[in-house]
Curated annotation (Swiss-Prot):
Disulfide bonds: none annotated. Belongs to the TFS-II family. TFA subfamily. GO terms for biological process: negative regulation of DNA-templated transcription; negative regulation of NF-kappaB transcription factor activity. This is Transcription elongation factor A protein-like 7. Pfam families: BEX. It comes from the Eukaryota. It comes from Homo sapiens (Human). Keywords: Coiled coil, Nucleus, Repressor, Transcription, Transcription regulation.
Length: 100
């Protein structure tokens, strides 16, 4: 058995930690949603500014970009055709009915 210290004689034996102030229920969640709301608001504001910048293009610039996009798509279609042709030629060359 432990002997009580002279320093601890006047104090209660078990020290109970003090409780923090009681917060209203849901305050933490409310603060978190406010923070998330602010972040989403700032992000949407930045996206809106970017959209506004794109809306100020002239019609000529938009049609030029559209033409460039169409040209790129045509190039992709042509490359796909070439790959299909090469693949089918390679496959047919292996399917010979007689050995070489």
């Amino acid at each position: 058995m432990q002997k009580p210290c002279k320093e601890n004689e006047g104090k209660p034996k078990c020290s109970v930690p003090k409780r923090e102030e009681k917060r209203p229920y849901g305050e933490f969640e409310r603060q978190q949603t406010e923070g998330n709301f602010r972040q989403r608001l700032l992000q949407s504001l930045e996206e809106f500014k970017e959209d506004i910048d794109y809306r100020h293009f002239k019609d000529e610039e938009m049609t030029r970009e559209g033409d460039e996009m169409e040209r790129c798509l045509e190039e992709i279609r042509g490359l796909r055709k070439k790959f299909r042709a090469l693949h089918s030629n390679h496959r047919h060359s292996r399917d010979r009915p007689y050995p070489i």
